[in-house]
Amino acid sequence: MESKRKVVLVGAGFVGMSMAYSLLNQGGVEELVLIDVNKDKTIGEEMDLSDGLPYAPHKMKIKAGDYSECKDANIVVITAGLAQKPGQTRLELAVVNAKIMKEITQNVMANGFSGVFIIASNPVDLMSYVVAEVSGMPKSKVIGSGTVLDTARLRYLIAEYLQVSSKNVHAYMLGEHG
């Protein structure tokens, strides 16, 4: 694996593009590759994000790509999956999204990926398990976003109640996300 900091982001929806925007602004990535089943959307997102490159803290390359880009990636972030529909249980969503995770993971691994997976697709705990099982990677190389969002919400609510900055609230949510 090369020493450059390369992230492949699979899923160009709201969560994926929020992640991409954060990576652009934080400057920790040298190359960001976007993959999505909707190729036209991915190209459009690449163009939009690239417009912000002059304001990025470091030199960075953004491109729409395919799974062959995973070979030399340090991290593959998976945000792809269907959203939960009204009346649909998380277990029903898990069945649908597990199929998507399996296909994505097989495509990533078929291209020689040996880095770290970060999973942000719901239900995240189950999707992380699917990726770990399908990839055959050590479980230490498959990280689910877990309760990070729940923790942020908890800290925000406590801060609002106490009328302080959420930066000054140190609390953590434990358990399953959702």
Q: Which role fits each region the language model picked out?
A:
Residues 16-17:
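N-terminal Rossmann-fold NAD(P) dinucleotide-binding loop
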Residues 89-155:
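Rossmann-like NAD(P)(H) cofactor-binding subdomain of soluble oxidoreductases
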